[in-house]
Every structure is written in C-alpha cells, then in structure tokens.
UniProtKB/Swiss-Prot annotation:
Ranges of compositional bias, category Basic and acidic residues: 294-314
Activity regulation text: The phosphorylation activity is calcium-independent.
Domain Protein kinase: 358-633
Modified sites of kind Phosphothreonine: 458
Protein name according to UniProt: Pollen receptor-like kinase 3
Residues glycosylated per entry: 22, 37, 123, 246
Catalytic activity field: L-seryl-[protein] + ATP = O-phospho-L-seryl-[protein] + ADP + H(+); L-threonyl-[protein] + ATP = O-phospho-L-threonyl-[protein] + ADP + H(+)
Localization annotation: Membrane
Modified residues (Phosphoserine): 438, 535
Gene name per UniProt: PRK3
Region listing for Disordered, in residue ranges: 294-339
Record-listed E.C. numbers: 2.7.11.1
TM ranges: 249-269
Length: 633
C-alpha cells in the first residue's frame, strides 16, 4: 500500500513539472514586453506567474503545450530596443516573428539564440550593417526574413553558409557589394529574394545553377549573370608582363596630360569670350551642406556704386520693372540677355537683383532641372532661387508671357513664383521658402520631429491637398499635354501646418523635347517608356506614385535615373493587391490606427488605379481627385 501511494506521489510531481517550467518562462517574456513600446493593441495577457502555454498569452506558441517555442507579435507598433538577454532564458525558442512593427536601430544580436530556426523581421526600420559572422552561431536557421528595412553594407557571408537555410528574403534594403556564394552543403534553399538593393557583380554560380530555387534580383542595376540574362564584363587579365603594364600606364598618362592641356585652352578661350558678357553666378560646390554658405557674385556692370539719392528710385524702379512685361532692367532690354529681377507676384513685397545679390545664400541641392539656393533678404523674407538650365525653347517675349501667367495663379496648394531673371543660357525663378522643406525630405530625410508628425491625419491632408492642387493645374493648363509634368515628392513643399504646395509645374512648353524627356518625371510613365507618348494621364501616374509613397513610407525607385536603391513601388503594390495583402503595404508608423485601416486600404487602391500601365485604364485627374476627397479619417 505504501508503495502504491509513493508511486502516485511521483506521478503527481512529474505531471506538475512542465507547468512549473512554463511559469518560470513567463518572467523573461514579461521582461521582453517591458523592454519595448507598444503603440497598437496591448500584451495584457502576458502576466508574471501565469502559464504562457495556457492558450491565453497572445502571440505565444508552445511545443506540445509544455514550453515556449515561438513569439509571433506583429502589427502592434512595437518600438524600442529588444533585449536578447531576456530571450536567452527560453531554451526552446525556435521562432521569432516581429514583422510589420516600428523596430529600428541596428539588428539585435539574435546570434545569442543558437536554437533559432525562423527569424521574421519584415517591414520594420532596422538599419546599419550586419557583421559578416553574425549568423555563424545560429546553424539551425531555416527562414530569415529581413525584407523592407533600411539595412546596408554587405550581405553577411555567414548567412550564405547556413546548410539548412530554406528561405531568405532581404529585398527592399540598401545592401551593397557582391552576393556571397551559397555553401555547397546547402541543398534545401527554395526561395531567395534580394531584389531592390544596390548589389553588384556576377550572381554566384552556386546560386544561379540551382534548380527548383525561386530567386529574385530585380532592382539591382549592377548585377549580372544568367538569372537576369545580363552578361558580365570580362575581367582584365592579370598575367601581363611588367613592360606591358608600364607601357599602358605611360599611354594613360599621356592621354590624361593631353586632355588637361586641351581643357585648359578651352577654359581660357571661353573666359575670354565671356569677358564682355555680364554674368550671374552662384559659386559653391554642388554638394555643400545646408549649413555652408556660398558667395553670390555679380558682374561689375551691376555692382556700380549707387549714391544715396538714387537708392530709393532704383528700388522703386525694380518694382515697376517687375510689373512690366518687357523685362527691361539693369542690363538692358530683352535682347541683351541680362536684365533685372522681374516681379510677377508682389504679395511678399518687391525686390530687385541687387537685393538678391546682397543676400547670403545656402545650397539646398541639385535637381533634374538645375540647382536650388536659399537666400534671406534684408527685410527678412526667405526665398528659394532655382537656377534652371536648358529652359530655352521659347523666345524672350513668349517666356515672359508664361512667367506672368504663372505669377497670376492663386490656389492654396500651388506655389506661385515671386519673380524671375532671364538669361539666354539659364533662368532664375524665385519663390517663397518653405521651412519644412519638401515632402521627400520629411518622409525620407533625417526622420526627426517633422517625420514623427506624419500621422495618418497629416498624410491624408497632404495627399488631398496635392490632389486639389493638381485638379486646379489641370483646369488652368487644360490645353497642355502635361499640365504639371514633374510631380514628385521633391516638388511638393510643406507649410508650417503641413499644407502641401506644388511647385515646378507646366514647364513642358519651356523645354526642348530632349531636355524635357530627361528632366521631367512624367516621362518615366509606362506610356512614354513603351510608346514615347505623354498625356494628362501621365500626371495621374505621377500622383499615384506620391499617394503610394506617402502611404507605404517607401522611397520609390522610379525617382532614380539609375534605378539603383529604393523600392519598386509599382511592382510591390500591384503584386500585394493581387494577393489581397493590401494591409501589409501600409507604413507601420500609421498602421497602428486600427479604426482607419479600411480608409488607408481605399487610398492605396486609388493610388494603384493611378499607376495602371495602360493610360486608358486610368481615370482622369478630376475623377481621381473626387475619389481621394471621399476618403475620411
């Protein structure tokens, strides 16, 4: 009898052992919860002293109901720093799934979890480089999803040495360099996606020759190899003799010397020819930071001393000249190629070229049409001066007429220029400076305070404002093939209240056709790429790109001439919608607004309708704007 009772006691003890172990596993999970911020939903079911495997802990998976084997916490807006030390106390943890959150910073040291089999971190904001030996201590990894983050540097060689790796998704990052070869010991890899990075070189034969491997490399312009049907350039032979190398070096030196002499002579001749022509130049390196100033230099003919009795009359003359059509200024009439500033909009006051010359300027950047500078006038007015090249299709009088027309535009979402300066070789267009800069900067810049203010409500306000501005331009310039022609996030400026103002519009008639096709974003629409045609529907395509850019938070690769970097937002969106995965497109930073998911998805669908490859399948601007206006918070 005693033996029977003892046996029963042992059975009872063993039956409680897993439960006690489970309770002990609750502590590291609760510490993990406390280490991160949760902006969407909660993890209230995670409580110390309770069993994580009781089926009530959200996102916790257990092995045979006895020990924690997986953490699946997605779309909760998690941010902060993951403490891997807490997770080390979960000896049977095999899967970590934290995709579609707001996690940022360097990739945490998951290599401290040697038993890990699945690491799924898609659609976060992890950044920085990954050490080459990062995955050396995680030999059991089978699935690694790091796609759509901001990771950079080279792909870790240790990752491609995992013999059991079955799926690897790293698309939509900023990885560079060559793809490491896949270990010969790996016979199970079935899915590899490295698209939309900045990789280069030949795709390793250990990958390209694999059968039954689904692989994607699109969006890496410098990759080559059989999967892409792009031949690789032959590498130069390294077996040449020393004499051959010396002869080659001498030949190269002679060619360079000749070119330098030739360029020096050309520069002297050009300078001599231009001595008699007055010139407006903003000196400074094209890539100076915003904090560096540049000198504004004018020719001596402009900088004549002005006695005090004439200062007022000259200033008034500038204002009057601004209101005149003929544009006569300090350098003469239309035929001279050099005049004063011509005012087309005096709402912010009037100024002349000398006023602009006295202002210290800052380089803002270079665009497809030229460079931009910020200048602060003596009266405190901050302006942007755009120095535009190749805008020489129209004669002087026709150009003046167009600029006067721009100056009369009035709409809360359209930036009206203040003034312009005419030269045969280049034009200056002056407009009001917007302190919050462009939508491009706020979305993808330093991700500071302005970026943090891009809530769902603010993004909807921006999209609807851009749509209204485009509707206005399509009415004002209805006879133009491209009422805007260059709509992109860098040409959408933001006021203090995030009211968008569209700039750089209706330039097509001012540009030579070959310059327009290289400088204007509408010429990247499918109809021009395929059939060399543009229409107002091309503006609809550009609006769609902006809608999707704002809603996903991704930088479109379509903006880049080389195609290197960014996300192929057209392919990504169309593919996700076809698979009914629209919610996965939403920027995690606004996806926490669960009450508005339907409205966000509707806006994504409108954006997708704008980018249809066939322009006949796109609605016109007015219809698209009407749909956008119907979206509410």
């Amino acid at each position: 009898m005693t033996a029977v009772l003892f046996l029963c006691f042992l059975l009872i003890c063993f039956s409680f052992t897993p439960s006690l172990q489970n309770v002990s596993e609750s502590e590291p999970l609760v510490r993990f919860k406390r280490s991160v911020n949760i902006t969407k939903g909660d993890l209230n079911s995670w409580r110390t002293g309770t069993d994580p495997c009781n089926g009530k802990w959200f996102g916790i998976y257990c092995q045979k109901g006895q020990t924690v084997s997986g953490i699946h916490v997605t779309r909760l807006g998690l941010s902060g720093t993951i403490n891997i030390e807490d997770l080390k106390d979960l000896p049977n943890l095999r899967t970590i799934r934290l995709d579609n959150n707001l996690l940022s910073g360097p990739l945490p040291p998951f290599f401290k979890l040697p038993g890990l089999k699945s690491l799924l971190l898609s659609n976060n904001s992890f950044s920085g480089e990954i050490a080459d030996d990062f995955f050396k201590e995680t030999p059991q990894l089978k699935r690694v999803f790091l796609d759509n983050n901001r990771l950079s540097g080279k792909i870790p060689a240790s990752l491609m040495q995992l013999a059991g790796l079955e799926e690897l998704h790293m698309q939509g990052n900023q990885f560079t360099g060559e793809i490491p070869p896949l270990t010969d010991g790996n016979k199970v890899l079935k899915s590899l996606d490295l698209s939309n990075n900045d990789l280069e070189g030949e795709i390793p034969i250990t990958i390209s020759d694999r059968k039954n491997l689904e692989m994607k490399f699109e969006g890496n312009q410098r990759l080559c190899g059989s999967p892409l049907n792009i031949e690789c350039d032959e590498k130069p032979s390294s077996t040449g003799s020393g004499n051959e190398k010396n002869n080659t070096a001498k030949a190269i030196f002679m060619v360079i010397l000749f070119l330098l002499i030739f360029l020096f002579v050309v520069a002297i001749i050009t300078r001599w020819k231009k001595k008699r022509q007055p010139e407006f130049r903003m000196l400074g390196k094209d890539h100076l930071s915003d904090q560096e100033s540049v000198e504004v230099r004018v020719p001596d003919s402009i900088k004549k001393p002005i006695d005090s009795s004439k200062k007022r009359s000259n200033a008034e003359g500038s204002s009057k000249k601004g209101s005149s059509h003929n544009g006569k200024g300090a350098g003469g009439g239309p035929g001279s190629g050099m005049g004063d500033i011509i005012m087309v909009n005096s709402e912010k006051g009037s100024f002349g070229l000398p006023d602009l010359m006295k202002a210290a300027a800052e380089v803002l950047g270079n665009g497809s049409l030229g460079s931009a500078y910020k200048a602060v006038m003596a009266n405190g007015l901050s302006v942007v001066v755009k120095r535009i090249r190749d805008m020489n299709k129209l004669a002087r009088e026709a150009f003046d007429t167009e600029m006067q027309r721009f100056g009369k535009l009035r709409h809360p979402n359209v930036l009206t220029p203040l003034a312009y300066h005419y030269r045969r070789e280049e034009k200056l267009v002056v407009s009001e400076y917007m302190p919050k800069s462009s939508l491009l900067y706020v979305l993808h810049g330093d991700r500071g305070v302005y970026h943090s203010e891009l809530t769902w409500a603010t993004r909807l306000k921006i999209i609807q404002g851009v749509a209204r501005g485009m509707d206005f331009l399509h009415e004002e310039f209805a006879s133009y093939d491209l009422p805007h022609g260059n709509l992109k996030s860098s040409n959408v400026l933001l006021s203090e209240t995030y009211e968008p103002l569209i700039s750089d519009y209706a330039f097509l008639p001012l540009l030579q056709p070959n310059n327009a096709s290289q400088a204007l974003f509408a010429f990247k629409s499918p109809e021009f790429v395929q059939n060399q045609q543009v229409s107002p529907k091309s503006d609809v395509y550009c609006l769609g790109i902006i809608v999707l850019e704002v809603m996903t938070g991704k930088f479109p690769s379509q903006y880049l001439n080389t195609g290197k970097g960014g996300t192929d937002i057209v392919e990504w969106v169309q593919s996700s919608i076809a698979q009914h995965k629209e919610e996965e497109l939403i920027d995690p930073e606004i996806a926490s607004n669960t009450d508005s998911i339907k409205q966000m998805v509707e806006l994504l669908r409108i954006g997708a309708a704008c980018i249809a490859s066939n322009p006949n399948e796109r609605q016109n601007m007015k219809e698209i704007v009407r749909r956008i206006e119907r979206v509410t918070l």
